[in-house]
Amino acid sequence: MSFLSGFFGPICEIEVVLNDAETRKVSEIKTEEGKVEKHFLFYDGESVAGKVNIVFKQPGKRLEHHGIRIEFVGQIELFNDKSNTHEFVNLVKELALPGELTQSRNYDFEFMQVEKPYESYIGSNVRLRYFLKVTIVRRLTDLVKEYDLIVHQLATYPDVNNSIKMEVGIEDCLHIEFEYNKSKYHLKDVIVGKIYFLLVRIKIQHMELQLIKKEITGIGPSTTTETETVAKYEIMDGAPVKGESIPIRLFIAGYDPTPTMRDVNKKFSVRYFLNLVLVDEEDRRYFKQQEIVLWRKAPEKIKKRTNFHQRFEPQEPQASAEEPEI
């Protein structure tokens, strides 16, 4: 709540009401504290329109101001440097010239076909948010109200979506072939694949498939990478034999990941990897990582009216030094 204090409480409050609030879809986003917030959902190119209501709580009071404005803001904030926020979108509409308010007032606003180039995101070290910001400019302290929105980026891909197929192993000890049905998956997709054991001369006790998220912030020597295991899928528990084939079926939607986000405004990236992990009887861990792309598929009714952003092909993943690679 934003208000200007008088002797007996707030003189006024600021409200922001969207014109299509009754019909516009609401989406959820998880904050850095783990709480879930709900806000109205927008796509790139959509207009943002509504009313700003200045509601007086104390009849007879006066509010002198040096102008009233509303801004549409797209902002990136790095948590390790909160003093250095970057605005990649800032549109301003002047609602009122300097003057005096003595009663409640409503102001219409509209930002036409607003460019929203990135998806809303809150991660371990970075937040990308969109919001409407109403400011009543005053001599000493401005009166400010922020109203958060959520933006989803929709992507389309050509029909060609190559499968991932690799043979990996440890010389004279283990040789396996794994295959995933695609290299790009939408957020409601299913990862389907199989593991085929060509040679088994070490005793494998456990095998699992992990969906790994890597959030990379900063550039150059100041780069920070946060790694999170989004999902684990147990492929087998026990020793495999030569010639054995084990199917994989991992439902992505159950883990609610974000899309792949690459080099967002030269501030951060979010990348996803499938990590195949094997554990032998001496508790040694072997792994093989393969990068995949996650993308947000457009509903049919949205496809006809929304601009899409084609994603870049992923770069070759780098091997981790934490565990021996297969």
From Swiss-Prot:
A single GO cellular-component term on record: early endosome
KW Transcription regulation (keyword) present: no
Region span, Disordered: 306-326
Comp. bias regions, Low complexity: 315-326
Keywords: Cytoplasm, Endosome, Membrane, Protein transport, Transport
GO biological process annotation, one example: retrograde transport, endosome to Golgi
Localization per record: Cytoplasm; Endosome membrane; Early endosome
Predominant place of localization: cytoplasm
Gene3D superfamilies given in the database record: 2.60.40.640
Membrane topology annotation: Peripheral membrane protein
Similarity annotation: Belongs to the VPS26 family.
Quaternary structure (record): Component of the heterotrimeric retromer cargo-selective complex (CSC) which is believed to associate with variable sorting nexins to form functionally distinct retromer complex variants.
PANTHER family in the record: VACUOLAR PROTEIN SORTING 26 RELATED
Function: Acts as a component of the retromer cargo-selective complex (CSC). The CSC is believed to be the core functional component of retromer or respective retromer complex variants acting to prevent missorting of selected transmembrane cargo proteins into the lysosomal degradation pathway. Retromer mediates retrograde transport of cargo proteins from endosomes to the trans-Golgi network (TGN).
Name this protein carries in UniProt: Vacuolar protein sorting-associated protein 26A-A
